[in-house]
Design a protein with these regions (language model features):
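Basic, polyanion-binding surface patches
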Residues: 1-196
């Protein structure tokens, strides 16, 4: 499923993560690339857009992100739930007949517009960012601060700075990891009004 992409203003970039979706983190360094699933990411600042993502010490994606100083967050949807689960369960250091995860699982990708990071086709949003190094926090908590430098989303589900989760686009709904290979989907978007 090839996605439609539209730029998201950086002022709205954090809105892509405020509902707590599972993300696929991708990174590249000196021609080596990898991706992994991460359940824990959140906005921490809106201007400039900064997020926090947890990357376990044992992961190859973390190693590449540290070496390059940048990473990307790809927001997968229900249409690619099996791929999302699989890339989170396979170690990127274990090559399959010399193939990296992108090649092994036939993951189509495209270059990010600012940092040239590998972004995953079939997702519904993409963010590129530079690491804001905090070694003590990284080593103690596996938490990484990232300043977002580019954001894109599929306008069929995210437009004008807002998510639009409706039954008609359920194959585009983001994934929310519940553990042990189970995921939840947002079922609808509702609008609140302020009480007087």
């Amino acid at each position: 499923m090839s996605a439609v992409r539209a730029d998201v203003p950086l002022a709205h970039a954090c809105r892509l993560l405020t509902h707590g979706p599972t993300v696929i983190v991708s990174a590249v360094h000196e021609g080596r690339r990898n991706l992994m699933t991460a359940a824990w990411s959140t906005p921490v600042e809106f201007e400039p857009p900064r997020i926090l993502v947890v990357l376990d010490k044992s992961t190859y994606t973390r190693e590449l992100a540290l070496a390059s100083g940048c990473l990307a967050l790809n927001l997968p949807c229900s249409a690619i739930v099996d791929l999302t689960y699989t890339v989170g369960r396979v170690d990127g250091r274990e090559l399959f007949e010399g193939l990296d995860k992108f090649e092994r699982f036939r993951i189509a990708s495209f270059e990010g517009p600012v940092l040239g990071l590998p972004l995953v086709e079939g997702c519904v949003a993409w963010l590129e960012g530079r690491l804001l190094r905090e070694p003590r926090i990284e080593d103690t908590y596996d938490a990484f601060f990232v300043e977002i430098v580019s954001a894109q989303a599929d306008p069929r589900i995210f437009a004008a700075g807002r998510w639009n989760f409706v039954q008609e686009n359920s194959d585009l709904h983001t994934l929310h990891h519940l553990g042990a290979g189970s995921f939840a989907l947002p079922s609808a978007t509702i609008q609140a009004v302020r009480l007087d």
